[in-house]
Amino acid sequence: MNVLEMFSLAGKVALVTGAGDRKGYGAQCAEALYEAGAEVYIASRNMEKLSAFAAGYPGMKTIEMDLEKECDIHHVISQILRESGRLDILVNNAVARTALAQWDLPMADFDRSLHANASALFLLTRLAAEAMKERGGSIINIGSYMGMLGLDHANYENTGMQTDGIRWPSPAYHYEKGGMLNFTRWAASVLGKYDIRVNCVSLIGLEPLDGERNRFHRQHSSRTLLGRCCGNEDLKGGIVYLAGKASNFVTGHNLVIDGGYSAI
């Protein structure tokens, strides 16, 4: 097979969760899969943003989904199978953040975050895997350097994002993204026999689309070997690679796209 053909996703059906925000990782994922030839569904609870994003990509389909509602997750997979007859690629990108959560946040908030993020990830993966068992497929979990490393206080100094060293980012986010890494390995170990590959992509913060960097962006960038945050196309190549035949022998892997941040 020609190497360029290995990166083609023609004939594949993909689902990207949380792709409605043009400033987020999901937008890059959806755009990359679409450009590589896949039929792409995007799902989020904000249909206005989803529709606005999809309008720029003829044929891209939108589905409303709230991570906190199990029935929504079942509906998304069912609708894709009903309309397209298959599902080949799942990108678990959606996340419900516990904003500015402190060390002493109420346990109800912590539990709600786990339900929306960890539990939803598990259910989406399970349902997608069932849909993929006949033909195989690729599941890609969008992680973070926060799932690999402890809190780097230098990123947040004098940004207004931190109080007493533990205000931001959320401890629940670190907990969930760290768990995502090992869940990826576990899922890969049980789904390999069905030719379903499961991988993770761990990223750093995104550059602002308008180019207006704040103190956080400047400090975060200075901690990378390439001197910047993740650009609006830096994720696309990795996603297409993990989604298609180019990575046929790659599973249980964490692809780190961080400009060398974790190498220091």
Where in the sequence are the language-model features?
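Conserved NAD(P)H cofactor-binding loop of Rossmann-fold oxidoreductase domains
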Residues: N93-T98, G205, G260
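Alpha-helical segment proximal to the catalytic Tyr-Lys
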Residues: E130, S189-V190, N248
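Substrate-binding pocket helix/loop in short-chain dehydrogenase/reductase
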Residues: A101-D111, H153, H220
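Catalytic loop of short-chain dehydrogenase/reductase
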Residues: I140-K193, G205-E207
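Short, small/polar-rich loop/turn modules that mediate ligand/substrate recognition or access, typified
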Residues: G192-R197, V250-G252
